[in-house]
UniProtKB/Swiss-Prot annotation:
Subcellular compartments: Cytoplasm
GO biological process: DNA replication, removal of RNA primer
Protein's name in the database: Ribonuclease H
Entry's Gene Ontology cellular component terms: cytoplasm
Molecular functions (GO terms): magnesium ion binding; nucleic acid binding; RNA-DNA hybrid ribonuclease activity
Amino acid sequence: MQLKSDMKRVEIFTDGACKGNPGPGGWGVCLHFNGETREFFGGEPVTTNNRMELLAAIRALQELESLEDNGQQHLQVQLHTDSQYVQKGISEWIHGWKKRGWRTADKKPVKNEALWRELDDLSQRHQVEWFWVRGHNGHAGNERADRLANQGVESVLSKKAD
């Protein structure tokens, strides 16, 4: 493992959006690395807000593989989300879920287990710090991710109209 000072830093903002819950949803990612900004979004026709929040974080961490292809490894990632579900889930709750065989404290199956497993796997590949940011509070990175997530919703709705 490299020392923190040797690692390349990546700052990521993610967001999910849903019109109805469940309903058409979208996710958005704004990634800053080495003076470059990458923005991308997507969506699903029938989903939930929590699935979209998780998918945004997953897509963001998957994008890091393209940075690795360019020789960037051992990335120090600061991932900002306005979803306490994602932030607390990946940094606090997941440890108990795994110990209990992907069950919650009250012995119910963890919702979105496949997405949580994927997020857990991806987050192990780098040094990821998870930050919660209050949504719709004027934070530029979060506001941009929110706009991208809404573009994801619109892309799904426009496909339905075709």
